[in-house]
A protein has these predicted regions:
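Intrinsically disordered, highly charged
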Residues: 254-257
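Hydrophobic alpha-helical topogenic segments used for membrane insertion/localization
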Residues: 227-252
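Active-site-proximal beta-strand elements of phosphoester/diester hydrolases
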Residues: 21-31, 73, 162-168
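Loop/turn elements at helix/coil->beta-strand transitions in domains of secreted/extracellular proteins
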Residues: 20-22, 65-70, 139-143, 159-161
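Binuclear metal-dependent phosphoesterase catalytic core
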Residues: 10-18, 116-117, 122-138, 150-229
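Catalytic metal-binding/acid-base residues of hydrolase active sites
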Residues: 30, 77-78, 145-151, 168-170
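Active-site-proximal segments of metal-dependent phosphoesterases and phosphodiesterases across multiple
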Residues: 65-139
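Extended active-site neighborhood of metal-dependent phosphoesterases/phosphodiesterases
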Residues: 1-67, 95-97, 184-186
């Protein structure tokens, strides 16, 4: 159909009866926003949401009036993913991540330590187009899976819907040291599903494209080390400047005597 994006579609999964028992939604979350001063990344547009709601209503009607249980996959995560987190306390800053876009002034940690690995602030759009609320309205989406943020594999429920990140699985884009992974999603005929993460190292594989240090530290540790080095550098420069200023001031006083 003539709607925003190139890959908005769904795939019904039939059970033993030959009738659809489950559904998989695939949405095109596009690329950059038309005005990057407002938002770096694009949104799911209103015409895409309308298409989803119309198709969901059609599937509901064909399913005797009950929502057809579904999972949804798209690249850019929804802004509601930040509801899996809370603002970091001062003593938690060492493990916190900086928010993205209009949330950049805040630092976050996961609310639940069992929600996976958070290594960077989710790079969601700064504009909330109402996609998540649309899922709640239609009642069919049980879980949504995202890419985009290469180092995160967090997963947790927001208002009864699982929001899960899929970490990068390769080494050619920025990644998390030797820890790329895949997320396995298993759907059962009763409409339930489960998901798990399996990393490159779980399979006892050795990456030949990473150096010995890169294999042993995560990107997050590398970022922390860079921040620490920068902080030490700034501290040293500040101390040197202050010391130099102090000496200059003393010299000036001596000359005045």
């Amino acid at each position: 159909k003539n709607i925003t994006g190139y890959s908005n579609y769904y795939i019904p999964i039939c059970g033993k009866s030959g009738k659809p028992e489950f559904n998989l939604w695939f949405m095109d979350s596009n690329n950059t926003f038309y005005d990057t001063d407002i938002s770096a990344y694009d949104i799911i547009h209103r015409d895409q949401i309308d298409w989803y709601e119309q198709a969901s209503a059609k599937l509901r009607k064909e399913n005797k009036g009950a929502p057809l249980p579904a999972l949804l996959f798209q690249h850019i995560p929804v802004l509601e993913e930040y509801e899996l987190m809370r603002k970091a306390k001062p003593w938690e800053m060492w493990k916190a991540v900086r928010g993205f876009g209009h949330l950049r002034k805040n630092w976050y940690v996961l609310k639940d330590k069992d929600n996976g690995y958070l290594a960077e602030g989710p790079c969601s759009p700064d504009v909330n187009s109402g996609q998540f609320e649309s899922w709640k309205k239609m009642g069919d989406v049980k879980g949504a899976f995202f890419g985009h943020d290469h180092m995160n594999n967090i997963a947790g429920e927001v208002d009864g819907i699982l929001l899960a990140q899929c970490k990068t699985s390769g080494f050619w884009a920025y990644t998390d040291g030797g820890r790329p992974s895949v997320r396995l999603v298993t759907v059962h005929e009763d409409g339930s599903f489960e998901t798990s993460v399996h990393s490159f190292k779980d399979f006892a594989l050795d990456c030949t494209c990473l150096g010995p240090i890169e294999k042993r530290i995560t990107d997050r540790q590398s970022v922390n080390a860079t921040i620490a080095a920068y902080a030490l550098g700034v501290g040293a420069i500040t101390a040197a400047v202050m010391l130099g200023a102090g000496k200059a001031c003393q010299s000036f006083k001596n000359r005045r005597k």
